[in-house]
């Protein structure tokens, strides 16, 4: 209802002008009247919107709030555009003004959505008149997932991957050009030990044209780490290998690329299962920019030499001992660290092409434990004047995935759970649930159906269970809860879609004409009002970067539809009620499918 609320805001401002002429307003009165005075109703029985400013104004102008409310309501009723949209305002309690959209407007909005693929969600318009050539004010970079080479993706990567993907989908739908970057950990001292181990254990891989598989890359990493920790000679060789790699030694680069390719294949298997699209641009990409970063910071007199290291001291950043804590930009041995690479990435991403990405907004999706790191890096980038005034840069933090005991989710042996194992178990549990249900219902389905449904439900449940939580909070992982057909779960949403598909299979044409639709039942109006909230919900997600707002809306929509489905006849209704209710079924299905696609969640028509 974004357009409706905007028109109501305009009508309200016109009423304010007549009731409170500009010349008679105090600064406090002006402040109240120019605030956000039109808000969604707190309860359905209060209508669609509320105006609550009469109470604040009463204290300022020393008049009873109901009198003020009555004057505002009177002016609204004389406003032609307001009358076209709303029923007469109702004054409640000490001076609240309740507004209800009239039926004609609601039906008009339903008509519009029936023929609109975007379901009433506006496409964002961007001002390109003053944008420099090759720079776009709608280009957004989302940095998410970012696993480390030679290590398996674990449950900790799940949140960054699916939250980042969902935000990318929403922003793309709103009209932004989104670059999804996978900032993989493909550089650093750990490659010294990995390359040394590879050269000694499987040297043939460096000289063959055939693709050689390292069957267990994780075990390979563990072997190399064990040798590094226990063998001083191996440790020295590994350190030398880091120098060789950084110097561009041909054989070392071949070994490094082989390790990266092996990891990339394993990562892609996970991304394919989760339907994640990413552009890989690892830490190594920024190596060539690191010296320029140091020189720029040095020229701007931001660096301080602290025991041979080049550092920046930020106001308020102190260690556990209370002493100022530096952010090291270049180590005393000349090496660089994560902060240096992240600074180079920020500079490149905000620089106009062809020397950078020309983004207007950077979004980093990582665990909350990195908040301090990014806060420091962002402050340095601002001090260096790398962030244009019209650009945004923000950290999108998320909490831990916990077991049902409230502790960090781990295997029984105390190890971090592999993401592939988590997905496999979700699908297997969904398969077991489906087979039990088929047996209970005496239903027979082929293996292809069972495979498709169990895979879809398993993946959907994993994703939705995460996205439906406020990302800032920790959440408790439970297969039983996420796979349940009851409550705020993916199966509950999918079941609403299945019900609508069932109506279509039973002869309900969801492509019916909307020429003569009419509604009489409260369940119909409840569903209409819920359907019309989609645009404002997506606007919230775009602004707040909280996918759980969309999940909550889809759950409420499914609940509202199920009440409508259970309490109002659809296929057996007489015309025009039958066609009108099929229209609502059609728009509900489209809304659920759109919303779930923005969450990256697959859908079904049969379960």
Swiss-Prot record:
Its EC number is 6.1.1.19. GO terms for biological process: arginyl-tRNA aminoacylation. Signal peptide: none annotated. It is found in: Cytoplasm. It catalyses: tRNA(Arg) + L-arginine + ATP = L-arginyl-tRNA(Arg) + AMP + diphosphate. It holds the Pfam family DALR_1. It comes from the Bacteria. Keywords: Aminoacyl-tRNA synthetase, ATP-binding, Cytoplasm, Ligase, Nucleotide-binding, Protein biosynthesis. PROSITE patterns: AA_TRNA_LIGASE_I. GO terms for molecular function: arginine-tRNA ligase activity; ATP binding. Its main location: cytoplasm. GO terms for cellular component: cytoplasm. Monomer. Belongs to the class-I aminoacyl-tRNA synthetase family. PANTHER family: ARGININE--TRNA LIGASE, CYTOPLASMIC (PTHR11956:SF5), ARGINYL-TRNA SYNTHETASE (PTHR11956). NCBIfam families: argS. This is Arginine--tRNA ligase. The lineage of its organism: Bacteria, Bacillati, Cyanobacteriota, Cyanophyceae, Synechococcales.
